[in-house]
Amino acid sequence: PAADKVVPDANQYKYQKDELAAFCHFGPNTFNEVEWGEHYGNRSPADIFTLPNNFDADTLVSTLKNAGFKKVIVTAKHHDGFCIWNSAYTDYCVKNTHYKNGKGDVLAEISEACTKYGLDMGLYLSPWDIHEPSYGYYDANGKPTSKENDVLDYNEYYNNQLEEILGNSKYGNNGHFVEVWMDGAKGSGANAQDYEFTKWFDTIQKHQGKKAGKDADCMLFGAQAYTTVRWIGNEDGVAHENTWAKSKVNEANNTIDSNGTTPYTIGYAD
């Protein structure tokens, strides 16, 4: 048969060879026994994020490395909107907690340990942000409105945070992230924010892809038509035997069809 023109790039090939990657869901929900953090309301960062000062990123990363893991993906911001790094774009972050008297930076500490032990890093930065006022479409009085009359630009806010992390060499393994992990969950109604994926992905690759001198572009998960590593279709960790098969991408409509059939995404082997 004729050779298939669809072949993995260097990062996709390495993704398969790595075999073991850790996903570290770590944030306010860790201390509040909830999954998404929809009900924090006006509770302060110090109230919801109670990380003790003896948190040891070195032990966390060295344990993963010794267990054979090749990468750790860190939730820098989950749907609750809290940032585990010191962000200049929101007060809803670790600098306003009691952790190390507001001087701690969890993402930087994990990054330093990953650099020390040579463990690749992936960045989880949730596009859906329950806390951020600019998410969704609201007028100057905070009332729901149309996209055209929206007064605050969430897409710019998110892009600024991508720049803040990906453009700073203190984050990542030697300043590098091999993967950026997004998420399909999002709000509805006035909170049904449209995402400027093209702008975001230009920012990602500018700092972490070929444009930055890397061998291959940064891997993207949950990025619609830009996705380069796709979901298996469930959160049970069980994949279909055809999960290796390719997806069909519709760039015009910014969609990806991975032939989903509960509870798997099978792909197309033809």
Spans of features found by a protein language model:
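Mature catalytic domains of secreted/periplasmic carbohydrate-active enzymes
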Residues: 1-270
